[in-house]
Amino acid sequence: MKKLFFILLASIFFTSCGHKEGAHNHDHHGHHHDHEHNAKLHLTGYNDIFEVYAEADPFVTGQESTILTHITWLNNFKPLSSGKVTAILNVGGKQYTYKVDLPIQAGIYRIAITPKESGTATLTYQIETRDTTSTIEIKGIDIYTNEHEAHEMAEAITPKSINVINFTKEQSWDVDFATEQAK
């Protein structure tokens, strides 16, 4: 009786887990993608004064990438409300610089950079306030020559879960919430 039960259970399991041909009509390996690429790069950097969290379009040579840069004071975990920010993308010995004098809202600076070289880059932020000048580097950013490849890579490294609860940087500024670099 136990043997019959086990065989019945195993057959139900294997038939329910089967993949039926034609049930998936999205040709992911072909070149006919009708979906939009919305994945963003999530970049984080720290120093003793600031945390920088940036949401960036994947970087592609010859195309403008928009970077929404969130800057947080580490002493109180509140947004940088004023100050000048310079972003420098260094790739292959070439530097691409973008300066912003004011945030679009407290703590958020919109930056646009168009790299002309591919390779691995470093994004350096120079943050100038009335009282201090500070630098933060974020290394290991890939610049692609192909838009499709750049977006596919960004999608591949974006965590996916059906049980996601988003907690934005803006929300963290409104409550007593702090982050800390792992040591």
Feature-to-residue mapping (PLM):
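Intrinsically disordered, low-complexity terminal tails/loops enriched in metal-binding residues
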Residues: 1-183
